[in-house]
């Protein structure tokens, strides 16, 4: 009876192991970069001026869309107060929730990032 129990236990363990192995090889996940106050630069991360220069070079090399300067809103153009006041629409836009996305420093300095992640900051 003990040998039957031992055989079933071994068979169960092999089945669990193979299932986990297949799950790991089949599952394709996306990497999620996380940072905390204790994060330190990755040995192969891009930091400081190196990061800035790389983004500048990639953006100038691989993006074709030129940035168009925002036209001033008609009510802001001629008003002397336009330098210190903004429209209601713009003011309310600051109250909306920002997209929760790691910063470029978190993604590319404290972690190692891809060219596609760098291009997202163009």
UniProtKB/Swiss-Prot annotation:
Which family, according to UniProt?
A: Belongs to the insulin family.
The signal sequence is 1-29
Q: Name one GO molecular function term.
A: hormone activity
Q: In which tissues does this protein get expressed?
A: Expressed in the cerebral light-green cells which are giant neuroendocrines cells involved in the control of growth.
Subunit note = Heterodimer of a B chain and an A chain; disulfide-linked (doubly).
Provide the primary localization. Answer: cytoplasm
What UniProt keywords apply to this chain's record, in alphabetical order?
Answer: Cleavage on pair of basic residues, Cytoplasmic vesicle, Disulfide bond, Signal
Q: Which residues form the propeptide?
A: 71-87, 91-96
- Give the originating organism: Lymnaea stagnalis (Great pond snail)
| Disulfide bridge partners, by residue number | 47-109, 59-122, 108-113
Protein name, as recorded: Molluscan insulin-related peptide 3
Cited SUPFAM superfamilies: Insulin-like
Q: Gene3D superfamilies attached here?
A: Insulin-like
């Amino acid at each position: 009876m003990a040998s039957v129990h031992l055989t079933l236990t071994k068979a169960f363990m092999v089945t669990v192991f193979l299932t986990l192995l297949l799950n790991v090889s089949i599952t394709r996940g996306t990497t999620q970069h996380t940072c905390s106050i204790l994060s330190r630069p990755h040995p192969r991360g891009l930091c400081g001026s190196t990061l800035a220069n790389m983004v500048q070079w990639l953006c100038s090399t691989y993006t074709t869309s030129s940035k168009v300067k925002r036209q001033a809103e008609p009510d802001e153009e001629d008003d002397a107060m336009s330098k210190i006041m903004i429209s209601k629409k713009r003011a309310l836009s600051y109250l909306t929730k920002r997209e929760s996305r790691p910063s470029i420093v978190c993604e590319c300095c404290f972690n190692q990032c891809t060219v596609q992640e760098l291009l997202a900051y163009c």
